[in-house]
Amino acid sequence: MDKIYDFVIIGAGSAGCVLANRLSADPNTRVCIMEAGIKDKDPRIHIPIGFAFFGPNNPVSWNYETVPQKEFEEVTVAEPAAEVVDTAGGVHSFKQEIKEHRRGAQPRGKTLGGSSSINAMLYVRGHRWDYDHWASLGNEGWSYDEILKYFKKSEHNEMFDDEFHGQGGPLNVSKIRHENDPTKDFVEAGSKLYKHNEDFNGGEQEGIGFYQTTQKDGKRCSTAKAYLVPALDRPNLTVITEANVNKILIDDQKATGVEYIDAEGESHNISAVSYTHLRAHETL
């Protein structure tokens, strides 16, 4: 029998975790969030420097790559064996190198929290001009002044408490815990040459300074940590990991649920009474 929910969220990434928290806040709403990756238990996720040690076969990333980049060096991608027959009938084997320009890594999170669980934890909002430009194109509600309240609602900023920042939100924002001497020298020199900016997420982004980070008590504060973990005890929220969605079920031009494959290769269906939300990866 299909399991039935009011909302099914496909993808427990940055947006999916927020949706799961907000929707399940209503105890009368049944919410299911599905993630293709594993749970975010790997300590390399939570220790800030850990993301640098995942390597090329990252178990919590989709491990995407770019097309070959002409600016990169050439590398051998294959060495197919071939045989030739000489005029005397002798058979000779040889390998022929096939080379192409190296591809660039494009890691994207495949775990609870999505890319917020494997990124560099830099907290930098978009530029005011971009939001105002979107609004000028007819997207009502997207100007900087209109969305600022949502930035403030989402964060708990340990550094600033002013008209640009919020307190008491789920996403913890803190200063870098270790400002090493070479970086201090760089910031000092850049500030003298141009100008210093203590807060890239304040009145303006231009200038030189230290980043703010999505960390709490020296650990990563992913959207899974900020939004999903506080909601896990809600009886109306179901989290399914290692669930590869195979098909969105459509009935009369309406998404009514999903078909997915679990970690053992078994197929299951889930029905959504109200809404099926698909979170696709954003790659620019």
PLM regions: where:
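N-terminal redox-cofactor-binding region of secreted/periplasmic oxidoreductases
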Residues: 1-282
